[in-house]
């Protein structure tokens, strides 16, 4: 992560807005899934090995309850090529799950975690329910269940929750 971020040194921070506007799209069914889960009092968090610039915008746009990602250092409108704070990787995702469950006053066994890559596995293994979403084979093999051929709102049927 640090080597990849270092390549961004000197880039004008406005490039992040361009990436967000032109390339970032929620997965199909995201809005329906979020609305359906929240209508039943379920809290939604986005935890990503990506960057807070994007996750905070998605949090606001989609009405998510929580978000955690890596913070890019920006000085005088330019990326420095450094990440501030602890890097959110596999261990960071698991730690966030534990932290969030503590904040919500629930056990990790009462939480569900969904992911698609190897850096999601520690978090998914710590949750009471793990869902592989269009995931790599190794992730599907370790998850409690997998959604391979549907949109994100397939989670509603999986959990027996009606749409909002």
Regions found by a protein language model. Give the residues of each.
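C-terminal cap/substrate-recognition subdomain and adjoining C-terminal extension
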Residues: 9-164
């Amino acid at each position: 992560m640090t080597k990849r971020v270092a390549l961004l040194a000197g880039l004008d921070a406005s490039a992040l807005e361009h990436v967000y506007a032109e390339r970032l799209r929620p997965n199909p069914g995201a809005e329906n899934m979020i609305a359906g889960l929240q209508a039943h009092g379920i809290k939604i968090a986005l935890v990503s090995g990506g960057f807070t610039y994007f996750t905070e915008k998605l949090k606001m746009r989609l009405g998510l309850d929580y978000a955690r990602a890596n913070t890019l250092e920006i000085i005088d409108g330019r990326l420095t090529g450094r990440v501030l704070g602890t890097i959110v990787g596999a261990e960071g995702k698991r730690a966030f799950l534990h932290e969030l469950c503590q904040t919500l006053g629930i056990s990790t066994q009462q939480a569900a975690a969904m992911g698609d890559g190897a850096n999601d596995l520690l978090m998914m293994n710590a949750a009471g329910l793990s869902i592989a979403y269009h995931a790599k084979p190794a992730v599907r093999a370790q998850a409690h269940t997998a959604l391979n051929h549907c949109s994100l709102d397939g989670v509603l049927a999986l959990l027996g929750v009606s749409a909002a």
